[in-house]
Regions:
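Active-site phosphate/pyrophosphate-handling residues
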Residues: 10, 35, 54
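Nucleotide-sugar-dependent glycosyltransferase catalytic core
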Residues: 27-29, 56-77, 125
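Catalytic beta-strand/loop signature of glycosyltransferases that borders the donor
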Residues: 44-59
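Non-catalytic, C-terminal membrane-associated alpha-helical segments of glycosyltransferases
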Residues: 70-78, 91-154
């Protein structure tokens, strides 16, 4: 379930990951692997997956106790930023409309399934509130001066 990667130094430098500090702004860098691989793909850097590789994953804060609130918050917050930065901004008129419909569809089902989990006691009301707050905060960040100053990804 985790990612382990090896890369050439020049390829990592070309990804320019330093410009994605927003990923780690809330104590848990959710979607960092997705962002790294997507930026590599945008730049034409080839990647390969070895599905049967065996390695010992030391820690990426996943083993830290009481980390669930930070994970929930960052997962939703970072997904909104990722969508806007890498999907929405890269599209033309029709693509932008389509990407809004797609993220809306995903968010609708995420909320519906979260409500079902809440009813089935698989999620607490506090956890649902964290996810909703992360969504609102992520949308607000899209309008912030800090976000507006970021370079385009291409």
């Amino acid at each position: 379930p985790w990612t382990c990667f090896f890369a050439e130094i020049d390829a990592i430098k070309e990804i320019d990951f330093e410009k994605e500090l927003w990923l780690d702004s809330h104590g848990y860098s959710a979607l960092d692997d997705q962002t790294m691989f997507y930026k590599a793909w945008l730049r034409g850097i080839k990647t390969a997956v070895v599905p049967d590789a065996v390695y010992q994953h030391l820690d990426a804060k996943t083993s830290t106790k009481n980390n669930k609130p930070a994970f929930l918050y960052s997962s939703v917050y970072n997904r909104i930023i990722f969508w806007h930065r890498f999907i929405f901004k890269q599209q033309h008129c029709f693509g932008k409309v389509w990407s809004v419909l797609c993220i809306g569809y995903r968010l609708f089902w995420m909320l519906l399934l979260d409500i079902i989990d809440l009813i089935r006691n698989r999620m607490t009301y506090k956890e649902l509130k964290i996810k909703i707050k992360a969504f609102v905060d992520g949308c607000r960040y899209l309008h912030s001066k800090e976000y507006q100053k970021m370079d385009l990804v291409c």
